[in-house]
Amino acid sequence: MLELAHKLADSDTKFFGGWVLAGVEAHIHGQANQLENRVLLEKERKCIIQVRGTTLVAGAEQLVKELRVFLVLPKNKLGTKTIEPGAPTGKLLVEHTFTVQEVRDYVAYTGDENIIHQGEHPIVPGLCMAAWLQQALQKQELDWRISFLTPVYTGDELKIYATEQELAAYVGSTKVFLIKL
């Protein structure tokens, strides 16, 4: 996941000036020898960027990793939208509190220099949380469709709950992202 996020940072720098990750589709089924990215859709306030990872199998190029990110440029200041709290459901799998240093390390590795991930109380990058979760769950292969609902800031205690068909992340009683399995 981290190598896909690193390649994503090769995208046009205009997408790092306050754009927000609204959703991700991630498929990982092996090691890639080559990564490439391209913009699939670009509009005034939304875009879709794809990162593809391929390898040669019996002389033919085979897709083994793919990341599609849906970015939006919000009209309102982040954190101003009211989210209805709800009780988490499912089994608690893991929990983690991201630090400013973890975000800095992620930004340094991937090159994701979006202004929202900087400062003394930055927003934790969505792909940073996804990569942490992939590692925490020890997933070598995955097919995830992630919807990011509200920002997670450093210092927030993130808890991941599992049901049969999804993983839900909460900060307190607020659902912050959802992963369809």
Please report, for each region that a protein language model flagged, where it lies by residue.
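A conserved acidic, glycine/proline-rich C-terminal tail/linker
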Residues: 136-159
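HotDog/MaoC-like acyl-thioester-processing domains
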Residues: 2-3, 14-15, 19-94, 152-154, ...
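Hot-dog-fold acyl-thioester-processing enzymes
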Residues: 1-30, 72-143
